[in-house]
């Protein structure tokens, strides 16, 4: 992948494998940084006819333990067959202003490979109702007051403040449309005006 790739206002759904796959291979080395902004990933790993396919991650942000500072921000992952957001062993990915909801595996899983330093960034993230508790155990400093992670039963921040579906305008997906401002989800997973990180 060459330099300067940026996805803005894109949707990936019902792909046989992952929605976004930013995999780097040991054989070929690191790919260039990719920025994913105001994007949506849902129902990946599940074809539109109901058959399952590959891994089924929403946003896969790396691979083979190779560090690339890919950025994911202002984006949403829901209903993916595996994880909503995964570093896939990239120890340097950046995740900001992201909602990950009701994915079959982890909503958020950030981990590396080998003994290299973990340099993840995780800010203003909401994770609710994942298939398992979010995985940030390799860099516990990611747990902050402005990040709400799913522990398998509830979503809370570093202080222990809990949130639930009530922070959203709606949790019923009714499709999407494209507008000049991005993707309109008709209130689905939109934060209410009175919610403050």
State each model region's role.
Residues 115-197:
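Acidic, glycine- and Ser/Thr-rich low-complexity intrinsically disordered tracts
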Residues 89:
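Acidic-and-aromatic substrate-binding clefts and catalytic sites of carbohydrate-active enzymes
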Residues 1-16, 30-48, 68-83, 92-104, ...:
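Right-handed parallel beta-helix
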Residues 1, 14-28, 49-64, 79-86, ...:
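Extracellular beta-strand/beta-solenoid scaffold signature
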């Amino acid at each position: 992948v060459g330099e300067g790739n940026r996805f803005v206002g894109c949707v990936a759904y019902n792909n046989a494998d992952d929605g976004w796959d930013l995999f780097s291979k040991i054989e070929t080395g690191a790919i260039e940084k990719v920025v994913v902004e105001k994007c949506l990933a849902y129902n990946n790993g599940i074809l539109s006819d109901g058959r399952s396919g590959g891994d089924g991650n929403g946003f896969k942000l790396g691979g083979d333990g190779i560090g690339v500072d890919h950025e994911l921000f202002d984006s949403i992952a829901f209903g993916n067959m595996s994880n909503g957001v995964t570093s896939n062993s990239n120890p340097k990915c950046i995740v900001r202003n992201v909602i990950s909801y009701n994915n079959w595996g982890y909503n958020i899983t950030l981990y590396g490979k080998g003994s290299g330093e973990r340099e993840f960034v995780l800010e203003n993230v909401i994770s609710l109702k994942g298939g398992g508790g979010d995985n940030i155990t390799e860099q516990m400093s990611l747990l902050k007051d402005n990040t709400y992670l799913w522990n398998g039963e509830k979503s809370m921040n570093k202080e222990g403040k809990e949130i639930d579906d009530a922070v959203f305008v709606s949790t019923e997906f009714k499709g999407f449309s494209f507008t000049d401002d991005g993707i309109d989800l008709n209130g689905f997973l939109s934060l209410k005006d009175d919610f403050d990180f």
